[in-house]
Swiss-Prot record:
Compartmental location: Cell membrane; Secreted, Extracellular space, Apoplast
Subunit composition and interactions: Interacts with MIK2 (via extracellular leucine-rich repeat domain); this interaction triggers the formation of complex between MIK2 and the BAK1/SERK3 and SERK4 coreceptors, and subsequent BAK1 activation by phosphorylation.
UniProt motif (SCOOP motif) ranges: 51-71
Composition bias type Pro residues, residue spans: 77-87
Originating organism: Arabidopsis thaliana
Biased composition range(s): Basic and acidic residues: 40-49
Intrachain disulfide bonds: none
The protein's name in its UniProt record: Serine rich endogenous peptide 17
Spans annotated as Disordered: 32-87
Basic residues composition-biased segments: 58-69
Length: 87
């Protein structure tokens, strides 16, 4: 029994080390999910506001045309062919 005891100790220690490694990965994946708002996490609100700002900047960049802003011609009313009022 004494010959197998160190083997079990090493096995248990290795399993503990590996399990902490795997749980670390699970934590890294689970932090990407949105957090519940009732927790009052100010960090999550900051990230959310930053995302909104980035989206607004991206929308502004897409709306510009390649040739630059162009002036629209104002609408000109066509002159009436039979003059109904004196000019």
């Amino acid at each position: 029994m004494t010959g197998k005891a160190p083997f079990f100790v090493i096995l248990i220690a290795a399993l503990l080390l590996l399990s902490s490694f795997f749980f670390g990965e699970v934590k890294a994946i689970s932090t990407k999910q949105p957090k519940h708002r009732k927790l009052g996490n100010r960090e999550g609100d900051e990230n959310r506001s930053n995302e909104i700002v980035v989206q607004m900047k991206a929308r502004v960049k897409r709306s510009k045309s390649k040739r630059g802003p162009q002036k629209k011609e104002p609408y000109k009313k066509p002159p009436c062919s039979p003059p109904t009022h004196p000019a």
